[in-house]
Amino acid sequence: MRVLSTTLLIGAAAAAVSPPQQVLQAPEEAVENTHKSSPSLAESLSQPLRELKEELKLLTNEVEEVWEEVSNIFPGALDNIFFSSAKKHTRRPDSHWDHIIRGSDVQNIWVENENGEKEREVGGRLEAFDLRVKAVDPSSLGIDPDVKQYSGYLDDNENDKHLFYWFFESRNDPKTDPVVLWLNGGPGCSSLTGLFFELGPSSIGKNIKPIYNPYSWNSNTSVIFLDQPVNVGFSYSGNSVSETSAAAKDVYALLTLFFKQFPEYSSQDFHIAGESYAGHYIPSFASEILSHKKRNINLKSVLIGNGLTDGLTQYEYYRPMACGDGGYPAVLDETTCRSMDNALGRCQSMIQSCYDSESAWTCVPASIYCNNALLGPYQRTGQNVYDVRKPCEDSSLCYADLEYVSTYLNQAEVMKALGAEVDSFDSCNFDINRNFLFKGDWMKPFHKLVPGLLEEIPVLIYAGDADFICNWLGNKAWTDALEWAGHEEYAATELEDLEIVDNKHKGKKIGQVKSSGNLTFMRLFGGGHMVPYDQPEASLEFFNRWIGGEWTK
């Protein structure tokens, strides 16, 4: 759990539950654990690295100098690169599933438009996708036994990708309540950790039994928990995924086919929510959905919690948060804080080069340099990067209780009830983390997609104020700086107290909020990286009010 100065800290920024120290090296027995039936697996595992080599001839002298500089400062950061291994799996027969929705069938549904012309009912390329659905017996698992549940896989038959999902109906009025897609970050962390550790209907106790969660987000919404990208959680593939844009089309296909199978949900308001690296995912996924004018997805808003969206702005706030300017005592001494100040200029210069080119050759060294120079000093203290108030517990993920979740989901009876097809569940897959970093995805400017979203839907950026890794200072700063049509009015808006309004704790201050036009920012008091985990009551309070339209036009 300690950082070596010669390692690349790729697990350091933006995982909902990724370990704060992750050495870049080949997993033991990696080749042995690959799925032997994939003939092109060896090639696919090294795809991001091969793509980097293909671009070698395009290197300018300046970029070559940057790589030389990073190699000299952090000698060993690029040693022993290995890309993701496939997960062992056994596909269940079609007879196991209650429904199989063929994308090719949906693709071939034509309707007549207002001009009397024939057009497809929904847009997008769906012919390669199928959706498998199984009704989950809640009584067999003891999780929200009175709530209808479905689980299954989205299959991309063309690219051998299989994404697992688990759907819970609203506890309140599923016929009218909104539907929410929840995404954890990483990249490479399962959204089932969000389900059982944060905002789902149950947590898992020491006895590996479900414990009812009265603050679950399915109190007033139906929720889909999705394991993506592939090879995360119960999802699997013989190939690797290494960039956010590739996952966006998968998510669009899943939602389109799901709402086709269950049209009773398709007319209801739909929202996408997530945290951490979902600051990359959500702008991309929402943009993909909105790009299809003919769709059955009634997208109304997005919510990003403690996200990484604009690294150029957000990395500036690691020193202030670690050194006592974020509302909590300093974790680092003055000498270390000054060294972080000295490194900031070079870091921002590298990130700007990444923004300008969006090439892996500029984005990868920016990630290496900035993570080592600005996150490394904090990590070496052993303090929890997801909560400045706590030490990192004796766990690879800083929270020992997460082991209960993995133990529960690895039980044969649970996997059978859910229709899981892999041989084991892991909360986070750090090979995926490497893939995304070496594709350059980590530092790319996903905030540039947000102005387009704001033209059509409301956007909420919320942040627990005790988080270091995607802290509230940086999230407030990038939303303040964002160039969009309502920028001036938003920038002039002051933070106001956020209080509980509708229960016995009415009047209790839970944070601060500023909102103008379609953009809203919230600071949540006492919340770490995972606000629903640290502040469940406050989490459900702001979530219900946001879904209810309080801060939206």
From Swiss-Prot:
Propeptide: 18-134
Residues of the signal peptide: 1-17
Any one annotated GO CC term: fungal-type vacuole
GO biological process terms held by the UniProt record: proteolysis
Keywords: Carboxypeptidase, Disulfide bond, Glycoprotein, Hydrolase, Protease, Signal, Vacuole, Zymogen
Cellular localization per UniProt: Vacuole
Main location: other
Pfam entry (one): Carbpep_Y_N
Disulfide bonds: 189-428, 323-337, 347-370, 354-363, 392-398
Protein EC: 3.4.16.5
Catalytic site: 276, 467, 529
Reaction it catalyzes: Release of a C-terminal amino acid with broad specificity
GO molecular function: serine-type carboxypeptidase activity
Broad EC category: hydrolase
InterPro entries tied to this protein: AB_hydrolase_fold, Peptidase_S10, Propeptide_carboxypepY, Ser_caboxypep_ser_AS
Glycosylation sites: 220, 518
Similarity field: Belongs to the peptidase S10 family.
Function per UniProt: Vacuolar carboxypeptidase involved in degradation of small peptides. Digests preferentially peptides containing an aliphatic or hydrophobic residue in P1' position, as well as methionine, leucine or phenylalanine in P1 position of ester substrate.
Protein name: Carboxypeptidase Y homolog A
Organism: Talaromyces stipitatus (strain ATCC 10500 / CBS 375.48 / QM 6759 / NRRL 1006) (Penicillium stipitatum)
